[in-house]
Amino acid sequence: DMRAVLLAGAGDNGGDGLFAAAALAQEGANVTAIAVGRSLHEAGFASFVRAGGKVLVLDPAADIPGCASGFSAGEAGERLQTAIAVARKSHLIIDAMTGIGIQGSLRGIPAALASALGLDGEAPDEPALPNRESSGDFPLVLAVDTPSGVGVNDGSLPGPYIPATVTVTFGAMKPCAVLPPATFACGRIELLDFGFDIDDKDPDVEVVDNSFASDAVRLPRFEDSKYSRGVVGLVTGSQRYPGAAVLTASAAARANTGMVRYLGPERAQNMVLAALPEAVIGKGHVQSWVVGSGVPEASVEGTDGDMQRDTIAALLKHYALGSEDENKDAYDMPPIVVDAGALDLLPERVPGQVVITPHAGEMAKLLNRFETAASTAEHADSHEPYTADDVRLNPLASAKRAHELTGATVLLKGAVTIVVDEDHVYASGSAPAWLGTAGAGDVLAGLTGALLAQQDDVATTGETVASAAYLHGLAAAIASESEQQGWQEPELIGREHRQRFMTLGHPIVAGDVAHAIPEAIADVIA
C-alpha cells in the first residue's frame, strides 16, 4: 500500500494539501495528515475526513473538530516523535506547512519537523542531475507552492527546511524558485498557470533566457569595420598566471567583437599571440576594458613588482567618483569588468558601468573591506566579518549590499549567477555543473567585456552583463553536451510533455567554453 503523509499548516497552503491528500485517500492510499498548527483549512479538512484520511494533531492548544487537544507537554513530545517516524516510513511527504507569507526561519513545531526530516541552513549536497531528477529514495517530497523553511523572497536558507523532490507552484514563479540556494531545494518545478494578469508587474527577479540574451548581441552591419564592431582592452594575466590572458582574449575574440587589445608581460603576450594571432598588443582606443583576471591580489607574496597591478590601479582611478569634475570623467569612461586580482583595487565609489565579478570568497573579502570603510566613515560599530559561506547562503543580499556600498554593477558567480544593478535583479542558471573548472571565470570576464564593447548605451550594462552570464553557461552546456543546468525552466501543468531521459554530458576545461561561444551566440540570435 502507498503510504503518504501530509504536513498541514493552518492556511490556504494547508488547505491545498488537504484536498490533494483527500484525492490520494480516495485512490486507496494510506494517508495521515499531521496538523502542525492550531487549526486546519475548514473545507480541505472536511474533504480529507470524508475520504477516510487520518489526522495527527501536534499542538496541545489546537482546536480541530473531532481531534484530541489539551494533552500534556510529555504527550506532545511523543506525538512529535510519532509524526517524524510515520513521515520517514512513508513513500510520499506532502509539505504544506507554510506559504509565501512567512518571514524568517521556521519556529516551533514546523521547525522541529523540518530539522528531523530535512536540513538546517545548509544547501543540499547531491549530484547535479538533469531536470533535477530524483535519486528515487523514499520518501519523495512534494512541496505545495514553496518548500517550507526557505527564504521565499530572497532565496536564502535561514534555518531548518525540507528539500523537495517536486515543487508545485501556483500562478507565477516565486523568487525562491529561481534564486540560490533555495532553488536547489525546490527539486523539479511544476507551474500551475492560473491566468493571472502579471504583464504590467515589475518582477522581483528577471530570469535570463535566449530571447533576453539576444538583445545584447550586436548584429553586424554592411558598413562595419573592426573598430565599429567593438574593441576590447585586456589587462589580464601575469607572470604567475599567464594562462588567464589567453582565456580572456580567446573568449573576447569569439564573442562578436572586432578586435582584442592586450596589455601585459612579455610571457603572457607571447602566449596570447600563439593562441590568438588576431590579438593586437599595446595601448589604443577601446570600447570596454577587462582587468584583473589572472592578476594576483596584493596579499599574494611576490606581487609588489607586478606591473599589471600598477596599470590596473592607474586605470581604475579614472572611475573613482568624488568631485563634480571627477564624476563627469568617471561617467564618460567606457565600461570596465573588474575581476579577481583587481577587486582589491576598486575605488570606494564607482559608476554603474563598472562591473565587478566576484565568486563567493572574493565577495566576502570585498564586503569586509567596504563595510569596514563605511563603519569608520560613519563612526559606527564594526560589522561581523563575512565568510564565503555567508555569501553562498544568501547571495542575493550579498550582491545587493555590494552594489549599495560601491555603486558597481555586481555579477556574483555561482551555479545560478546573480546580477544586481540600480533597478534590477537578474538570475542566470544556464550553466551545467561541469562549468566549475579552473579558468571558467576568466572566460566569463572576456565574454562580458566583449558584449559591453558592442553596446552604445551604458544604461544597458546590467542587462548586458546578465546576458553574458547566460551565454557563458550556454557555451558550457554546448561544450559539455549537457542538458543539466543550475536552474531548469518549470513544466506547465496541463500541457502535454514527452517524458525522456536528459543528458548529463561530460567534463570540460575552460578553453572548451571559449571555443563554444560562437555556437552559443548563434543559438540565441537564431
Label every model-predicted segment.
Residues 1-37, 164-166, 172-340, 344-355, ...:
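Small-residue (G/A/S/T)-rich helix-start motifs and N-terminal tracts that mark the onset
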Residues 92, 97-206:
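Internal gly/pro-rich beta-alpha loop/helix module
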Residues 42, 65-66, 79-80, 152, ...:
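Short secondary-structure boundary/hinge segments and terminal tails
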Residues 1-99, 103-144, 319, 325-329, ...:
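Nucleotide and nucleotide-moiety/phosphate-recognizing core
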Residues 58-60, 71-79, 148-152, 213-218, ...:
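Short gly/ser/thr-rich secondary-structure transition/capping motifs
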